[in-house]
Amino acid sequence: MDNVDSDQTKPIPAYYCCYLLRSTVNKRAGLYVGSTPNPPRRLPQHNGLSKGGAKKTATKNRPWEMVLLVEGFMSRTAALQFEWAWQHEDSRHMSKGEPGNTKRRQRPRRSLTANLEKLHSLLQSPCFSRWPLNIRIFASDVYQLWRVWCDRANGTIPEHIRTIPDGNCPHNSPEPETDHPRVGSIDGIQTDYSKIQDYLEKAVFLLDDPNELHCKVCEAQAKPEKELVIVCPQASCFGISHLLCLSARFLKSSNDPNQLVPRSGTCPACSKLVQWPLMMQELSFRTRGGKEVQVILRKKARSDKRKAAAARPAEIDANTASNEPLESTAQAFDRLNENVHQDVLDEDWAEELDCASEDDTNERLKTGSKDQQRVEIVIEDSDEDDLEFL
């Protein structure tokens, strides 16, 4: 219960995934299912290059490779639920028959094909089929096997769940959407909030003057200090809406009476398609991120100043041209954090997300002040992953 309650007070993670490991020494020797907010950090731990790897991967099967990721989990709890269901073939999440008619296998199948079969079943199940997930595959043989299985399996996974061929998968594979480009390798995965910093800066700046804000759905005044207000993620759009107003509009337009949470919809201001999970991530970070919001946006302000100075002639004072909007944004930062709880994050908190099996990352983040203590926001890797042998 503590983990669930903690998830409800944190921003939606910048990144969280479940992953499938495979031994590079003997690709038929073992498979490992786990979850993490930081694959580039987690893989070296499994391979013994840094502390904190799971004991079950500390074997002669090293080195391991991450061949498949299931991305898009909105909380650590959600990722752990999916991970557990993927590990356990008799999970209720995968049951196809009526209670009492499904026989439990005496020995679970643990091959690569069996893992892909279980994954395919999970993504069709009522428990997970509506989640905003994507599959990223880094090994060409795994990608080919996944495509074969999707073609022959009963049922199909929902259209919004995309398969992204990456790594050494053939480049003539169908290209993914621009929102989910190829990254080349595990090290290319972006696990921090930098991808939404432009969006975040725009939102904070727009909400700086609440007297001029009106919901694009109900046209009533929006009060960011009292209500949850959403800003359109399109760079050229300045539309804002009440959370409940826009949610109801999106659900109505989906024509799906069983859908409880929107996945996407058309912005009432710019008429462009926008993704609900992205807007919720920005909203949760803006309202729960505390001083980390200031840290990220001040970094961006410095970066913008450097770019502006490099683009202007030497005789033009870059600071004069760029300070005015930044001052207004800085004022918004201060107001945003007046009522934020004093338990805040240091600037590098995203680099120190704890793993439950990472014994070396359990120290409390330190601040420069001896009188002020800060409580670390922790997003852990799982420590109950299942090593599978043939």
Curated annotation (Swiss-Prot):
Cofactor field: a divalent metal cation
Annotated segments matching region Disordered: 35-58, 307-326, 357-378
Any Pfam family the entry gives: GIY-YIG
Principal location: nucleus
Function field: Catalytic subunit of the slx1-slx4 structure-specific endonuclease that resolves DNA secondary structures generated during DNA repair and recombination. Has endonuclease activity towards branched DNA substrates, introducing single-strand cuts in duplex DNA close to junctions with ss-DNA.
Complex and partners: Forms a heterodimer with slx4.
Family: Belongs to the SLX1 family.
Name assigned to this protein: Structure-specific endonuclease subunit slx1
Annotated source species: Aspergillus terreus (strain NIH 2624 / FGSC A1156)
